[in-house]
């Protein structure tokens, strides 16, 4: 949401109000090129039969933090949509979504574009938890995707952050990157909701539970999941507004609750968002949504919980930096993160075949906890750890551009690029310092 600040300036006896410029990119600025390699983006999307030249809007399923699309949706939404003849695709994020949600946004952008191109029509999006806010990130910073989306249905989405994340990261530092970004005071949340929360031409249905133990506050229409303004058609509805006795919690509202599924189907079957009055009482007498097998439910739900609790990512002592493309001052089309970016350097002489060893440096008192290495645009290494000091990269191409991205324990992100010239004879190994 755009904030207008009136500043009182007394100069020559004149009271002059001024409007502070927003630090975030305007909503109509074209999005940057995707930084994630195309091969990884393609591999992240799994689709049902019928997606090509679809007869009706296909649904993009976006999972919550800690699980893949298969782990969350294979036992509920996937079979339920298939039973209704609705094609779908599920997108999965690196590290099960525990890492930087800005990167996850690129996966959703690719999924939207791919599904729109294959189906030949506008798509719908259903997301649970993080899966509710990351699609909004894609729509906010890649404007071309807005014309490709008809409906956005979110379940327990922390659209304005969660005080649970505030408390968790405040008590048990360090936290995973996505946890820091889910705090109500995070830069990610501020950027997500900058200028406007919705966009014209898209229908938004946000479903939440008052008994959600993870995403709060969520007691009424002013809670974190609810959206307001911006031009999109919006329905914000608590599960308990439809079924007062439904006490579903965070996982359930997005994976097996009948009210949430009924809201999704209502939004898909009608113009505009879901209308709670059309849902009737049928969801209130059902124990599970369609697609859930009551016999295997205990095992299916337990497997999802196990996957969620066992998923891990690096941990930081604070929120990582925002991507440059989110800021008003960034050059249009730039996708780099705000942080230290070293200029491109060229290794002197030539390097013989073998392994390049890179020494990773950071500020005194800090340490590198994550590193990614790209060779000619293709990611060849992704490593996390408590203290990373060196990495090794195979140098097979005669000439290569190597880009190294590190993230420190304190959330500082650095990027350096080095061009390496190969030769038939020469040093089989070289040491290149990463500034």
Please give the residue ranges for each predicted region.
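Active-site catalytic motif of lipid deacylating hydrolases and related acyltransferases
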Residues: 24-36, 47-122, 295-303, 307-314, ...
